[in-house]
Swiss-Prot record:
Cofactor note: Binds 1 Ca(2+) ion per subunit. Binds 1 Cl(-) ion per subunit.
GO CC terms, sorted: extracellular region
Catalytic activity: Endohydrolysis of (1->4)-alpha-D-glucosidic linkages in polysaccharides containing three or more (1->4)-alpha-linked D-glucose units
Secreted listed as a keyword: yes
Species for this entry: Aedes aegypti
Protein name according to UniProt: Alpha-amylase I
CC cofactor: Ca(2+); chloride
Not found in other alpha-amylases: annotated segments: 17-260
Keywords annotated in UniProt: Calcium, Carbohydrate metabolism, Chloride, Disulfide bond, Glycoprotein, Glycosidase, Hydrolase, Metal-binding, Secreted, Signal
GO molecular function, one term: alpha-amylase activity
Pfam families noted in UniProt: Alpha-amylase, Alpha-amylase_C
Signal sequence range: 1-16
Glycosylation: residue positions: 40, 166, 211, 233, 255, 388, 403, 532, 595, 619, 673
Length: 737
């Protein structure tokens, strides 16, 4: 029985939180009236047990009254966008910010341990309620003498605490939903009040009280008094917030600004596609190369279970069998570790997601996946999800790219075409993507969006969680989404149909830069690939992801054909990548490849088909069959150039048939020669007078330049000699004097 009294005492201690700044008298707030026997009545019973019973009974009545009188909270499609500015980010350990009022150390007595869960839950709610940043939090339970040990108090308070904790967790992700659940929460308050009353009555043994110190009795009486004010003020606060919600909330669920931010850390930019890399190798690359050199993020190849093909071709990753995280790159534990390590290095992770289709039929059935699942594509049977024939579009092949319905409802290369309008299919996709968000990813590359209806993708995107704030994302921010849509302006599906959903891959960029640096197009055409010059030619800059090549078109698949530059034409390829990183248009992605001669060839592997690690060669390039364009000095240093000039204007364009030059404010200058001839010319660099080291031909080492030195005069001009197919890039950090 002593244990029971300690439980009751602990519960009353937990309620000791004052909420100044809210006035809610018996007459109500905003037309809301509340009959309030608990707030205003005096307490007649002198016996503490009777007093507890009385207060519990009144607490129950008030909870029921609040439930009846609280106005219906309106539904909001996406209230988080407006509400998130009030939320407090959490640290990677899950605790609130270190200077928050609730960061107190618990003492080790068992009474404190028994109530710590409730105390944390209540304090977290207070931290999340707008306008209560200065409100004192539930204090530590004072050290109580002569308290015996006791069991788990959750038998009495578990339902209440669990409801509060669940509501808090939901409220962090969706505050509108939290307030809509108030009515569901109040019955738990009523039920626990009944429980308290019943337990209190059973404790009416006067002999028990003789063994409890007077200090505890007085403390319990004081806590009972404060409990009434606690309920009054919390009710007032909830009512106040609930009534103001309609003015705060706006449906911005389809506002593209919520999905076009890649969440690069300060001083970082650019995405690297580490095609077919293992998770453990990606983590090391983040720590050793990407983070230190200012890369912003990594696109990883599809990570969920996919077909095991006889030849282990690269395209097997694009034939999913289930959504279990297990691939040639590693398992879920290794993936989670990679995300955390890359985040600590300042590098974000974006997952390539394949949800347009499932694995295609093979020569026989069943087919086997990388996690051990089997499937029968001919029967449309994928038990690892599970999907069956009802989850797919009718059998047909794409044969008319001018017909959007044919492109979206029929099969791409005999791959069974999922019906994304099917609610079950949507739910499975959303569960998978939300799980990845829980693991800390920053967003997704959505494969084959051209073959899915925008309205179906919209239905999926609006139901995704925010990015996980535990990984240092802004509270409530939506995941970055970049969608593969091949649109060269000649087919029935347009990339512009997808720009209100997120960023779109701009394949016209690949063709344009490839043409210029192959020499088939004049250099002055590069002006069309700047933010100001691209209007009407390319997608708006904020809606475009740009790249020189990707895993498809470097193998002759998709768009571009012979215009596409790859690592196999190194000099021109470096020029194209350097321009992509130096200009002010779009979000840039750099390809990181492995050597191949057969377009179907998979990544480097050992004798048991385990992917080889890239390793480090003497010059910091890759070994074991990997190309690693992102490690090439010219590209690595252009990432640093890009980060330094970020936000500055692109101006003073100086263009001829074979050269193209421009300034990035007064921070940097770059010039390109796309001809087979050496060209010497005077350029305005916009930089202060001095000697500068060209970061393409060399770098600054111990105050000297290992490459070409450019002399800039007092007017900011310089005479520069450009060898054939070359670049000169200088910026403030490369100044020697």
């Amino acid at each position: 029985m002593k244990q029971l009294l300690v439980i009751l005492y602990s519960a009353l201690v937990v309620t000791n939180a004052q909420l100044p700044g809210f006035s809610f008298g018996p007459s109500g707030f905003g037309g809301f009236s509340l009959s309030n026997p608990l707030f205003n009545a005096s307490f007649a019973p002198a016996n503490p047990v009777d007093r507890i019973s009385d207060i519990a009974s009144r607490f129950r009545d008030v909870a029921n009254n609040v439930q009846r009188n609280l106005p219906k909270i309106p539904q909001f499609t996406n209230p988080l966008s407006a509400f998130s500015r009030f939320a407090r980010p959490t640290s990677s350990s899950g605790s609130t910010n270190a200077n928050s009022n609730n960061n107190q150390n618990f003492n080790s007595n068992q009474a404190n341990e028994g109530t710590s869960g409730a105390r944390n839950a209540i304090n977290e709610v207070l931290n999340r309620i707008p306008g209560l940043s200065g409100v004192p939090r539930v204090p530590e339970i004072p050290k109580v003498p002569e308290i015996p040990s006791f069991g788990n108090p959750s038998d009495v308070f578990g339902p209440f605490v669990n409801s509060l904790r669940n509501m808090t967790n939901q409220g962090i992700n969706d505050p509108g939903q939290m307030f809509n659940q108030v009515n569901k929460f109040l019955p738990d308050v009523s039920r626990i009040a009944n429980s308290v009353a019943n337990y209190a009555k059973s404790a009416a043994n006067s002999g028990i009280w003789k063994n409890i110190s007077n200090d505890i009795k007085h403390e319990m009486q004081n806590r009972i008094e404060s409990m009434t004010q606690m309920l009054s003020n919390i009710t007032s606060a909830m009512k106040n917030i609930a009534q103001s919600l309609p003015n705060l909330m706006q449906d911005q669920s389809l506002n593209t600004t919520l999905r076009n931010q890649p969440f690069f850390f300060p001083g970082h930019s650019g995405i690297v596609h580490l095609f077919e890399w293992k998770f453990s190798d990606i983590a090391e690359e983040c720590e050793n190369v990407l983070g230190p050199n200012g890369y912003g993020g990594v696109q990883v190849s599809p990570i969920n279970e996919y077909l095991v093909s006889p030849s282990r071709a690269w395209w097997e990753r694009y034939q999913p069998i289930s959504f279990e995280i297990k691939s040639r790159s590693g398992n879920e534990k290794q993936f989670s570790d990679m995300v955390k390590r890359c985040m600590k290095a300042g590098v974000r992770i974006y997952v390539d997601v394949v949800v347009n289709h499932m694995a295609a039929p093979g020569a026989s059935a069943p087919l086997y996946g990388t996690a051990g699942s089997t499937c029968d594509p001919q029967a449309r049977d994928y038990p690892g999800v599970p999907f069956n024939r009802s989850h797919f579009h009718a059998d047909c092949q794409i044969n008319d790219y001018n017909n959007a319905t044919n492109v979206r409802n029929c099969e791409l290369a005999a791959l069974p075409d999922l019906d994304q309008s099917n609610r079950f299919v949507q739910n499975k996709i959303i569960q998978y993507l939300n799980h990845l968000l829980d693991l800390g990813v920053a967003g997704f590359r959505m494969d084959a969006c051209k073959h899915m209806r925008p309205e179906d993708l919209k239905s999926i995107y609006v139901r995704l969680k925010p990015v996980n704030a535990m990984f240092l994302f802004p509270p409530g921010a939506r995941p970055f989404i970049f969608q593969e849509v091949i649109d060269l302006g000649t087919e029935g599906v347009s990339a512009k149909e997808y720009t209100n959903l997120g960023v779109v891959t701009e394949f016209n960029w690949c063709i344009a830069v490839g043409g210029v640096f192959r020499g088939t197009t004049n250099a002055d055409a590069l002006e069309l690939l700047t933010k100001n010059g691209s209007a009407g030619v390319l997608l708006p800059s904020s809606q475009a992801l740009v790249f020189v090549d990707n895993h498809d078109n470097q193998r002759g698949h998709g768009a571009g054909g012979d215009s596409i530059l790859t690592y196999k034409t190194k000099r021109q390829y470096i020029q194209a990548v350097a321009f992509t990183l130096a200009t002010d248009y779009g979000i840039a992605r750099v390809m990181s490849s492995y050597n191949f001669s057969d377009p179907d060839q998979g990544p480097p592997q050992d004798t048991v088909q385990v992917i080889k690690s890239p390793g480090f060669a003497a010059n910091n390039s890759c070994s074991n069959g990997w190309v690693c364009e992102h490690r090439w000095p010219e590209i690595r240093k252009m990432i640093q150039f890009k980060n330094f000039v970020a936000g500055s204007s692109l101006d003073h364009i100086q263009a001829t048939q074979n050269t193209f030059a421009f300034c990035r404010g007064e921070k940097g200058f770059i010039v390109f020669n796309n001809s087979e001839n050496t060209i010497t010319q005077q350029y305005h660099t916009c930089l202060p007078q001095g000697q500068y080291c060209d970061i393409i031909s060399g770098e600054v080492s111990q105050s000297t330049c290992t490459g070409t030195v450019v002399n800039v005069d007092a007017n900011g001009d310089a005479e520069i000699t450009l060898p054939k197919n070359s670049i000169v890039a200088i910026y403030v950090p490369s100044r020697l004097s």
